[in-house]
Design a protein with these regions (language model features):
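Outer-membrane beta-barrel signature, preferentially recognizing the C-terminal barrel domain
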Residues: 65, 79, 201-224, 313-319, ...
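Signature of Gram-negative outer-membrane beta-barrel scaffolds
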Residues: 279-385, 397
Length: 632
């Protein structure tokens, strides 16, 4: 979610996604992370949680302001990623109208990985070669410094403009426009693959420019009526473009696939107080997606083109999700109850103009409906303690990526499956939070445990066609995979955090999260389950100086805990899996007057080599970070 608009669209993939980088972090006001199924409020896909990005709003001129113009400039350099980021935003304020404009440009270069291989695998993750195309010939070149991951750099521009209209004392309107576009981005995990002849499998494997355009109008009012006390309505249009460019080593044929997605959305939410201690929230939501997927092959010798199989149905595809929902909040003494229900109707269809695979039909049309609900209980024994119990259901209706995708990764070919049904989650969560003040020490902790049953869970599994698990496609044999509804999945875990503040200027914070997931009957591990991870932070402020020491860590993820197929990127892991790692970062900041803050950081202090779980690229090694923030 971003500013009340769903980012999930018809071609969102399950698992590891990069779409969040299209939201400019320099213009964020907050980021809400909601754990557990949240289908009542957010609908399909909110099966495990919700991330809601909220960008800054323009500010109106008030009586204490001396100027109607204000702004901020930020710049940052990072040595390990060769990053140079620049951001500027400025606010124009009036009594009833205000505008906020933001511009961010980020450029990244080659990435230096850590050299301290505490995991013991001396060659794991090294970038040993790269390819050069010259005079219509590919050449495999040895990397003179295999710790430098060449060619992974990219640049990106993010633009945001929001205009706020104060309609009256109780109502306002915000027009929100956001645009993000990147350069080409290399897939190093594909470019480092070798064939049986020890030659590169690909000479080119790029994501093309990733574009996201959002335009929305948000109206809110607190003018009471019989039906509501507060109303918020958001109407939006999004345009998303993704593309992929691939060429095999020593081939003159470059494959290009382009996906264009348009999304129309509306969400109307109303709130009505009932008496002094209860409130009713209700509303409706509609999202309509269209997908135009095209692919062509470019002959580099004569620049001729020909049509090839597209990633998604080449005759077009769409999804339609209308829903109604309501929740009731009751507060009485030390107890708070929240119950909700949502009904969603889902429709997905696609057309294959030419049967790209013999066993495919001409298309598909799926119609489903889902009923989900939640019941949460909050108990406050005193002012500093909260205990909560949450029972909820969630669902995820198959989208076009689940139903109609054809793509190659490693030695696997994923084929469409139009027989999928929605997967459902039944969740139980129990948690407690506590705050304690003792003289000059403030202590707080929170802990949450969860247990989720997934029914008809969608997983990628092997498939046989005409009695064979292999298929000849694109001049090669591949193992066949397809998204399928499997048995019941069990996901459970525990998360917690502790914060301690000493003498108001020394603060310690720690958090930890553990998750496991398996299919109930076969005991096969589920995909995309991260290992144990956490962080330790120590922050000290002295006058205008701020010192930070940060420790991030991950436990190991061994091979036998990987999901089926290649979803957890087993080819990018070490022989044992993904080793555990920990890194220490340090940072010091200096506040010069009120308008200028300078920061200097040393990240990955001990130059540790590691990969985050399922990553196709090694993380940056020791790096120097310098930044400056100027307010005006």
């Amino acid at each position: 979610m971003v500013d009340g608009v769903r980012m999930n669209n018809a071609i969102y993939r399950g698992g590891h996604l990069q779409n969040s980088i299209t939201v400019d972090p320099f213009i964020l006001e907050s980021c809400d992370v909601i754990f557990g199924p949240s289908a009542v409020s957010y609908g399909s896909d909110a099966i495990g949680g919700v991330i809601h990005y909220k960008t800054k709003d323009p500010t109106l001129l008030n009586t204490n302001d001396t100027s109607s113009f204000s702004g901020l400039y930020f710049t940052r350099f990072n040595s390990a990623t060769n990053e140079l980021s620049n951001h500027i935003n400025f606010n124009l304020s009036g009594k009833n109208v205000a505008s906020l404009t933001s511009i961010t440009y980020k450029k990244f270069g080659d990435v230096s990985m850590g050299k301290n291989r505490v995991h013991g695998f001396q060659n794991w993750g090294l970038h040993n070669f790269y390819t050069v195309f010259n005079n219509f010939q590919d050449t495999m070149i040895a990397n003179s410094n295999p710790s430098i991951q060449r060619g992974v750099g990219f640049n990106q521009i993010d633009l945001t403009n929001k205009i706020l209209f104060k309609l009256n004392a109780t109502s306002k309107l915000i027009i929100n426009s956001q645009f993000s576009s990147s350069s080409n981005l290399q897939r190093l995990d594909q470019l480092n693959n070798l064939t049986l002849n020890n030659l590169p499998e690909y000479s080119q494997w790029n994501y093309g420019p990733q574009k996201r355009l959002l335009n929305s109008i948000a109206f809110s009012s607190s003018l009471s009526s019989i039906l509501f006390d507060d109303i918020r309505a958001v109407f939006s249009h999004q345009y998303i473009q993704e593309s992929r460019i691939t060429r095999r080593f020593n081939s003159f044929f470059q494959k290009n696939s382009v996906e264009n997605v348009n999304v129309l959305g509306s969400n109307i939410q109303l709130s009505k107080s009932i008496g002094s201690n209860s409130k009713l929230d209700y509303g409706t939501e509609i999202y309509y997606n269209t997908v135009d997927s095209r692919a062509y092959q470019l002959n580099l010798l004569d620049s001729s083109t020909s049509f090839i199989d597209s990633r998604y149905p080449n005759g077009g595809s769409n999804t339609f999700f209308p829903a109604i929902y309501a929740s009731y909040n009751l507060k009485k003494n030390r107890l708070s109850l929240i119950g909700g229900i949502r009904y969603t109707w889902s429709h997905a269809s696609g057309i294959f103009n030419d049967n790209i695979l013999d066993f495919l039909s001409d298309g598909f049309e799926i119609k489903r409906h889902s009923l989900s609900g939640s019941l949460s209980t909050y108990f406050y024994p005193n002012e500093t303690t909260k205990i909560f119990l949450d029972l909820s259901t969630g669902f995820r209706a198959p989208n076009i990526d689940d139903l109609g995708k054809v793509f190659i990764k490693d030695q696997f070919l994923t084929v469409p499956n139009s027989q999928l049904v929605p997967e459902y989650a039944y969740n139980f969560s129990l948690g407690i939070s506590k705050k304690i003040d003792f003289k000059n020490i403030q202590f707080s902790f929170s802990s949450t445990s969860f247990f989720t049953i997934l029914d008809n869970v969608i997983t990628k599994q092997s498939l046989e066609i005409n009695g064979s698990s292999l298929i000849y496609y694109d001049s090669n044999y591949y193992e066949i995979l397809a998204n399928q509804n499997s048995e019941i999945g069990i996901v459970y875990g525990l998360s917690g955090s502790v914060s301690i503040t000493f003498l108001k200027n020394l603060r310690f914070h720690s958090s930890l999260c553990y998750t496991r997931g398996t299919l109930k009957y076969t005991q096969v591990p589920m995909s995309h389950i991260p290992p144990l991870f956490g962080k330790l932070n120590l922050n000290y402020t002295f006058k205008k100086l701020e010192f930070q020491i940060l420790n991030n860590f991950n436990a190991e993820k061994i091979n036998k805990l990987f999901g089926q197929g290649n979803t957890d990127n087993p080819l990018e892991a070490s022989p044992m899996g993904y080793p555990s790692w920990w890194v220490i970062n340090t940072q010091v900041g200096y506040q010069y007057k009120e308008s200028l803050k300078l920061s200097l950081g040393l990240y990955n202090l001990f130059d540790v080599h590691y990969k985050t779980f399922a990553s196709g690229i090694s993380a940056p090694g020791r790096s120097l970070m310098v930044s400056a923030k100027l307010s005006f």
